[in-house]
Amino acid sequence: YADETVGGSAVPMGDHWTYTFEAAIPEDAEGSFTVSMEGRIEVEVDYGNETDTERDYAENPMMAFAVTDTEAVERRMVVDDAKCESCHVNLRLHGSNRHDVTYCSTCHAANTVDIADVPESVHMKWMIHKIHRGAELENGYIVVRSRGTYDFSNIHYTGDLRNCDACHVNNSQQLPLADNLLP
């Protein structure tokens, strides 16, 4: 996982932009990787007696590319955003510019923890289930970040937690899971 701020480093190429990552692909990398992006445009709006900064948030594009696979393998569809939106209505996180559940898995990958001092898994499949069960968990679910502590212990899922199809698609919750999935 590499996180880079593009800022003024992108180069216009006609109606597109190019950017060369500083982080190299690890020499032992295998399979397929995904490149994704988040962004927003900030515009100052003059309302006559005051000005304010408005933000227009971009979609979260993702592109899989093959490292050693013959063809790029896309991330599997586990949950559909439309199902999230049926409860959350315009779900946006981390400054409102992350709003696609598949995109979330780009950073919230296996073996990802919040901070080293008080490690709590933020792997998407672990984290999302714990958040939705918050109030039912014996010890709750608290995530400590550099920007603050987030306590999900009071979250009550309004549906039936046994109804996996309320969120999952394509029988993605069915066991046994495929052997080639990340832990």
Regions found by a protein language model. Give the residues of each.
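Extended surface/linker regions that mediate inter-domain or inter-protein docking
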Residues: Y1-P183
